[in-house]
């Protein structure tokens, strides 16, 4: 049962980890290109801060159309997690990367296409031996049809499992203890919180030219660094770096016009019945 829940959690994380961080950017699909790199030696003056606040507000307005209804949006994303954390008194080493595409339509249906490579290791306190988990795969999810697909290679405790599986999306998320309703995502509230951070006297803001910002702030007692990059057509890309429970986390979100496509030959994906050879 523990293994089933672990696999469900890994797959669900691939599908929805970034669904609560929706922002708008545009036309910078090459995630290997570090568009945020710059010489952030200049402290932002009052005019630059006002422009930054205006740009942040645009993130909220881009999420709706002229009639105030949800707009169709698309995002390229890259997430990295690396470091050591404590779990039940044991040190767990984690190194993971997730990349992909996340889109929403006017009806707030969410589609995702993600690839992930995740490895974790910990020492078994009973045997004092190192135990490792390795996961590699691709996943697709469609809230409108309530379907999810995964092409996975999973290894744990010396046992391997690989294959193509089809899931009931709600059941998958339920097994992982995750419940996400895109309609509950309050873009305006998130942007207002961000603007409050910008107004904090302890927040440091640096600029490089008129289209790059670096923000150093404390959020809930944790130091975070955010980068904003404004494209030529005025849209915003966003990167967040921080540390949580000993893990270095980076989230990079950029706009795209691409659409999520179903995997080829979906008939090759067998329904997952929860039975694993572990």
Regions found by a protein language model. Give the residues of each.
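C-terminal motif of bacterial Sec signal peptides marking the signal peptidase cleavage site
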Residues: 21-24
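Subset-of-secretome marker
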Residues: 26-278
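Sec-dependent N-terminal signal peptides
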Residues: 5-17
